[in-house]
Amino acid sequence: MPFSEPGKTKFQVDLRRHLRNQGICDNLVHLICEIAEASKYVINAVRTGDLGVAGTSNLYGEEQLALDVLSDRIIKKRLIHSGVVCNIASEEMDEIFQAQADADGLYSVAYDPLDGSSLVDVNLAVGTIVSIYEGCNLLQKGRNQVAALYILYGPRVSMVYSVGRGVHEFTMNHLMEFTLSRENIVMQEEGNIYAPGGLRNKYQEGTEQFVRYLEEKGAKLRYSGGFVPDINQVIMKGKGIFMYPALNGSPNGKLRLLFELNAMAYLVENAGGAATDGKQPILDLEPHSLDQRAPVYIGCKADVVKAMEFVSRN
């Protein structure tokens, strides 16, 4: 069924209805709706929860915040409750959790429960990032995702998802229900915004030259320190590039392939953009471990191609 242009919708389209109109199976509809349901509890935790440390460390040796642990517990519980998930992997878990042994008709989910959680105590936006695959294998290319989404906890709570048929934004209303706000989001070929992560004095020469190129052409620096709000800005404005490059001393950058990069690359590509590690598309990278990291340049196609040109020279 056709939908009105943003701002002209005469009736509200809820998430479940929109998912069913995508022509996907009922189990996938159910799973995405369960994740959306979990976000209601996560946003309550963000608004009212403990901002202290949990006294534990994650797989990467990073000290976990209480909100990280609570958000992870909330989402994991909803995934198990869904009854359609076999394997679960989270940035906060040390290993893959098996929810069910039978893979028939089931999915596996990799997620970052609260990306940017260290920003909560200064009241900046944070988010949840989710990748969904068919079957029980989580160590596969991002190209094989059947769905990806993120939920942004900002002044508004929004959810952006794709099942390979366009990218769509939903906004949580006063009843804590997600209703359609933008459909079939398409990015421009080139942008004028850039969000550069990492310490610039550790940039390798190719990335440094690319940043100078952006500065010289008048691009605006817009970086919050949160991956979800920064990618949301690029997608919603339809222009620009986010980067967290290889650094001197950290050749693989910082961001995790399974828990952060694959989902965002899937969404950006479905919106007409591109994502690369500087050599090949993020979605074509073969994961070998849960903690694998990769550099990333993600956003408008022309900007990403230009970044690759600079990086490949050095």
From Swiss-Prot:
Any one biological process term the GO annotation gives: gluconeogenesis
The enzyme's E.C. designation: 3.1.3.11
SUPFAM superfamilies named in the record: Carbohydrate phosphatase
Positions annotated to bind Mg(2+) 2: D112, D115, E260
Transmembrane segment boundaries: none
Pathway in which the depicted protein is active: Carbohydrate biosynthesis; gluconeogenesis
CDD domains cross-referenced by the UniProt entry: FBPase
Keyword terms, alphabetized: Carbohydrate metabolism, Cytoplasm, Hydrolase, Magnesium, Metal-binding
Cofactor or coenzyme needed: Mg(2+)
Positions of substrate binding: D115, G116, S117, S118, Y223, K254
Lineage: superkingdom: Bacteria
GO MF terms, alphabetically ordered: fructose 1,6-bisphosphate 1-phosphatase activity; magnesium ion binding
Reaction(s) the record says it catalyses: beta-D-fructose 1,6-bisphosphate + H2O = beta-D-fructose 6-phosphate + phosphate
Cofactor binding mode and count: Binds 2 magnesium ions per subunit.
Keyword Hydrolase: yes
Assembly and binders: Homotetramer.
Record-stated family: Belongs to the FBPase class 1 family.
The protein's name: Fructose-1,6-bisphosphatase class 1
Designated gene of the protein: fbp
